[in-house]
Amino acid sequence: MIIETHLPNLLHRGKVRDTYGIGSNLLLMVATDRISAFDVVLPNGIPHKGLVLSQMSAFWFRLTSGLIDNHFIGLADDQRVIEEYNSSNLLAQLPLEIARRSMIVRRAQRIDIESIVRGYLAGSAWAEYRRNGTVWGQRMPKSLKEGQVLSEPVFTPTTKAEQGHDQNMTHQQVVDMVGEDLARQLEEKSLAIYSFAHEYA
């Protein structure tokens, strides 16, 4: 089980991933076996969680690349990626247990918003609905059941907190943070990716 990694050029240690610099324009993102639940990193991990997380991420980044450009280049154990992007020789030296759970990505400017789409009445959406009859402030029909499919998916952005709880964001808060145009793109692209993945699954 890998809870924490210790490689050269650590840039960031998040709730689940450790991120390292590779040259001037690439990053190595290592998915650990740390567990983050309800925005809290728990003391125990889950064996192979990071491996599964990276494999799933790679699958969806490849599949949705026609909908939106992304930063994904490849998995760190992919021989093609090693040959093309191994200028620092780091990739060839990675232990297999680290390489298999790691992605090589382009450096990009991160938007500190979690673009969440909800198609089912569950989790915090269910809790809000029980309290107020709303999901992200939008009035919902009466008598919905937990886990029920929503008539239309709802864009429910949150802050992307480094530590602690992510906070719900209103549309206006998103606009204030990134501007009207990018706020619209975030919502439209998030809903498009959700619909595509929902149809695929």
Which sequence ranges carry the predicted segments?
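Active-site loop/lid in soluble adenylation, ligation, and acyl-transfer enzymes
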Residues: 1-158
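A short mid-domain helix/strand-loop element embedded in enzyme catalytic domains
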Residues: 149-180
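A long amphipathic alpha-helix within ATP-dependent nucleotide-binding catalytic cores
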Residues: 177-201
